[in-house]
């Protein structure tokens, strides 16, 4: 399982995206070209791949100029490799969506991240989104391909009383699932970051995750199920093998491929996407470490697949194991 950020570009300004939360950090405006992707993911590499999750930490995959060509390259090698696209869906033309639908098949899934029920409400969080182009693209994916179409909504204060309306819209658009996310990024969880009790986005307590990780609740609309059998079998096998190494109840999900090895739009490889977010500073073993002085930043050139090193060289290098252990 690979998690790829085809593009670090985005047209939206979602307030709780790292782009907006850390305006002092200069975010990359990068993308992966077809030539770069083919150099990194050779046919031998694709022989080992079962799934690609296409989702940026700070960008949207559909804004990579070669995104459709990249999917076509993967599918031409093995049409059963699963492509999971996560997008806000804004600003693409009918022609683009028809091409996207043509290279996709029943093994693929697309998540449209839509929190509203019209342009005005969607813009309350997905600031600068474009409702009509989202709905048009969603309809084409549902009607002109066999891919699994998922409408994904984060529950906020402004939409919690409109969930039935959103469900109706999702069904009308031909979506297979409605996915409701109960987030943690609210004032009651992180008061200093989100204004405590004055957080205007926070919904009723029942729609806030009970843990420190988001919760997802899925409502099936079509009777179809996404085709993930082989990928899930592989994860389950890895889980049972790795579980023996841990005495506690928690098995790191990155070790079984649940998140996937992550390559961002710059070409840098990470153990998983959670480890790719820059931080100002943190304390580790009683020592304060600034991001720019961290082990990873100092050795980033050694784990970059856009350079002269292959993925095999990176993953077999001692520096990778040191990074993973750190």
Indicate where each model-derived feature is located.
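Conserved alpha-helical substructure of the radical SAM core
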Residues: 1-109, 124, 132
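Radical SAM enzyme [4Fe-4S]-AdoMet core and its adjacent flexible, acidic
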Residues: 5, 20-32, 47, 68, ...
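Short cysteine clusters
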Residues: 10, 14-17, 254, 272, ...
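Short, hydrophobic secondary-structure boundary micro-motifs
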Residues: 26, 53, 151, 323-324
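Non-transmembrane alpha-helical segments in soluble domains
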Residues: 41, 71, 75, 167, ...
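Cysteine/selenocysteine-centered motifs that mediate thiol-based redox chemistry or coordinate metal-sulfur cofactors
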Residues: 301-326
